[in-house]
Every structure is written in structure tokens, then in C-alpha cells.
Amino acid sequence: MSDDIAALPLQFTDAAASKVKNLIADEENPELKLRVYITGGGCSGFQYGFTFDDQINDGDMTIEKQGVALVVDPMSLQYLVGGAVDYTEGLEGSRFIVTNPNAKSTCGCGSSFSV
């Protein structure tokens, strides 16, 4: 994929890519990719999910950074356009987070939102 990050509908931060790279190295499976997806549920109607996947399905968007890939299915992508996948470590623990400008409201847990 091009290095023109302004054209990407979803940003994959350096911190997230670095953590994915470390986790994939721990799993000893270089075919793994971080998949971000949205499902119905949570206290605000939708929730974010993350999983490692070794498959890329038809229609998936792939963003590569630091030699690792973030994969998003087309249905989830429509809710994530303009957002970013990041990784943070703090007093609350460490986790992947989504910054989503399309979310009209979010829940205190940070993984649930409404549009």
C-alpha cells in the first residue's frame, strides 16, 4: 500500500504497529495480521473487536506498517472511516484503542459506541 497516509480511510499508528509486530513475533507466525471489526452489542449499540487472523478475505482493506498488517472488513470500515487504531499503556492497563470521529457517543468502557 502507498505511503500516502492522508489517502488512507483508517490510520494505523506507529505504537499499534509496533505492538502488533511484537505480538506476532511472540506467536512465531509471520502470517498473522491484526483484524479490527465492529459488531452489534455493548452498552452503546456497537463495539470494537480485535483478533489476529492469518486470512485476508475478499473486500478486506489492508494497511501495512513496520512490516505488519491491519485488516478491516468492508462492513466495519464504513463505521471507521477517518479513525485510527492505536495502542496505549497506562494505569488502566494496555490495550488497542480506536479513535472514531463517526461515533456520536461512547461508553465509559471505551469499546462501545453509537453512530
From Swiss-Prot:
Which GO molecular function annotation, any one, does this entry have? iron ion binding
Keyword Transport part of the UniProt annotation: no
Q: Which cofactor does it need?
A: iron-sulfur cluster
* Annotated cofactor note: Binds 1 iron-sulfur cluster per subunit.
Q: How does it assemble?
A: Homodimer.
Q: What does this protein do?
A: Required for insertion of 4Fe-4S clusters for at least IspG.
The family line of this record is: Belongs to the HesB/IscA family.
What name goes with this protein?
Answer: Iron-sulfur cluster insertion protein ErpA
Q: Which organism is it from?
A: Pectobacterium atrosepticum (strain SCRI 1043 / ATCC BAA-672)
What are the leading ranks of the lineage?
A: Bacteria, Pseudomonadati, Pseudomonadota, Gammaproteobacteria, Enterobacterales
